[in-house]
């Protein structure tokens, strides 16, 4: 059977079982033993499975893998990998190490609970040798499960695990094609929003490029690039946090424009902190980019261009969320998975107008549905003022029709802006209902991107 032929999960598991050079262990917690099960049911499992274990009891798990880490965390996954790999090599390297590529597959999963009130997610890891006797290589995923039931989640995890093991042994090409192979037959059932690789088998792979490739492949809705540490899953920075989001293209990041973006985000964080009125809460602020183009029909920004913008923002101490889609309501959807605290967008008038002018053809409810999803119960838009001359140019660039405004000393704020009829009635409503919150005119004149 040609290696280029696309195999289903059953065929992949059987091919691995019949390959006498690959042999390893499985440790799965939280979603059954669905990965190991594939190898056990297709036939020839003795050619692949040295051990399969699930340590559900916390005391048993602590005895095997140590204490101190959350049970569903990268730290726990790494402890599992260290333990399982160490045992495998200690027990089998002498007897069959000269002709065996060893591997240890582990996962720790928070599956959907009975009430369906949690956010199902988990960590998946694989340590393996690319050739017998070789140094170990490692790949770690953070995943989000999107299936509506626990049995379906388990099924998807099983497919993902088989795909991963098959891909490292038979399809370890470029990062993008590797990810496509790992995601085969999964669709939108599992998101991968974090990847970490190490070892000679992944030489030349760039982790940040891989994260962006996840978005381009439709495998994640967002990835995170903090300024002070290495990449983490969005869950790690959004969980139960009050959040301020500053979306933009950030195409122009010369010192002047960069300072404007920085000031807008900082102003939003200050304003939300003032809303808390003395509560000991520190909002988290993020610059938000999109892997899609700002204007419909334009080509999407490439990986190199996105990394250039990310580097420029990180150089100024900015934490970044990079989203797969451009629409603001998709950002609300993602952030509200992880927090019920206050969420605030900081937007300029030009982006506000784009949001109202955008054609939401993919939504059954069009603009009204987009607006209702954007302005969820915990969401408000802080609207940053803009100079009248810049607003005029922006409206021409957008080709927006019927917008009018007045200004104060050359500056236009949200209450001074008027869309065309009938949008003006809806605009008045969201403004009067405090979903749109005007921000103060800056003390010194500045142009907005």
Where are these regions (language model features)?
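Long, charged/polar, low-complexity intrinsically disordered N-terminal extensions
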Residues: 2-16, 24-25, 31, 37
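Active-site cores that bind ATP or allylic diphosphates and position pyrophosphate for catalysis
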Residues: 4, 23-26, 35-38, 43, ...
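Hard-cation-handling environments
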Residues: 19
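Short, glycine-rich nucleotide/cofactor-binding loops
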Residues: 28, 246-260, 362
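Short active-site-proximal "capping" loops at secondary-structure junctions
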Residues: 31-32, 54-58, 292-294
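Nucleic acid-processing catalytic cores of prokaryotic defense/repair systems
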Residues: 46-55, 60-65
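Conserved catalytic-core segment of nucleotide-activated headgroup transferases in glycan assembly
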Residues: 253-268, 293
